[in-house]
């Protein structure tokens, strides 16, 4: 990978159990692109799911987005983002046929199937694939400045990664259809 798209830190939790235990914290690390998810992100998440599943010391996974970088003088501060969806520029650079296998072999399904609890710590935008990643987690915690949405319809697509099914299970058919068909966004207050 050309950049470290996922920073992983396993933190030991003192007194968590007689045998000890750790929390694996995964930070989506593309703040310059609002933590947009690319094929390298998918590979890294799937690799970490395999690692965590086989490590009995890890008790829980927390997924979060890297905070925005401080701009150079005169630069504009980017908003915070958990993950602003798929990195569309990768589709344009590599072509959809080269990128499609990474998205079809779904990393979100690997998160969903983990036997250990998963927590999405959402601060800022969780759009498209970012919402789908959060939906794949067992628990979602969002700051008051978070926004969730499924804007894929604006590209002539429907949400992938289990987004329509998981969203429908959580908020019902009517609200899911409203979000999916309009590309609308909801605040953390409305979403949670």
Model-based region annotation:
Residues 26, 30, 44-45, 63, ...:
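Terminal peptide-recognition signature
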Residues 43, 57, 65-110, 126, ...:
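Glycine- (often His-adjacent) and acidic-residue-rich active-site loop
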Residues 36-39, 84, 93, 181-182:
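Phosphate-coordinating loops and pocket residues in cytosolic domains that bind phosphorylated ligands
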Residues 110-192:
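Crotonase-fold acyl-CoA enzyme core
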Residues 1-72:
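Conserved CoA-thioester-binding segment of acyl-CoA-metabolizing enzymes
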Residues 29, 64, 94, 143, ...:
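Conserved residues at the C-terminal ends of beta-strands
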